[in-house]
Amino acid sequence: AEAVEDLGFSHLFRSDHLTGIYGHPERASLALWPSLTALAMRTKRIRFGPMVCAVTFRHPVMVAKMAASVDQLSGGRLDLGLGAGWNDMEHKMFGVNYPRYGVRLEMLDEAATVIKSIWSGEPVTFTGNYYQLEEAQSHPGPAQPNPTLIMGGKGEKTLKIVAKHATEWNFSYGGVDLFREKSRELDQNCAAINRDPGDIRRSMMAPFVIGRDEAAAQSRIDAHRRMFSSLPATLAEWNEAGFIGGSPSRVIDQMKAFTAAGIDRFMLQHNDLDDIDSLTLLATEVLPHV
């Protein structure tokens, strides 16, 4: 976290998991909210948050309370990513209920309503299919009036929920053409509920590798695949999957293409936490040009 701040990055996000994923439960996985509290204490400038907090893991009132508390402790630097949950094996391992996808989307819709209502500081009565509140209020609220609420996804129902609730839509795992298509769909969903599409920021999340040249970038892919074997094997396959990777000039070209299509910010997944050299190269050779 301190390296990210010192290098000039704007944000640092954490995933929300109960165990190591992708077939490696033996790997360390710090609990989300305590680690964000520590991050708040160890940094001064960067914004941060979960990407994303799964609604299947916690009641939305608890999410609202923890998010508001961390926002207070950090002086208003929290962005909240909220999602429907996705890792079925993780839920099964710990006996956490994992409803079908349509139900999880309904839970996400209700959870976003509950969280924003609790943040208002006013008494809230809410009767949904999954959550019920009666004159509920919780103080203190967030330090910032309306923390950024980030939602991801590309599905038809998901994009309607994004249009209804989110202040930022996160696109992932796809190319420029797919982003344009889904961004237009989101615009249409906003128009259907009389919301200005410009109110919703567009961001992109993707795995990334970078090297001084493409051979060095390929070496980093090889290292990442030793941790996550499902990742693409070659730099060409990496880029075809919509991932960001290559030499600094190649990464700049990829990011500029997405920026021209409407991406406002990039969330680059850094799988090797000990690899500060890649972050330094990204900060010095890429960020000044995008």
Indicate where each model-derived feature is located.
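Active-site-adjacent structural elements that line small-molecule/cofactor binding pockets in enzymes
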Residues: 1-290
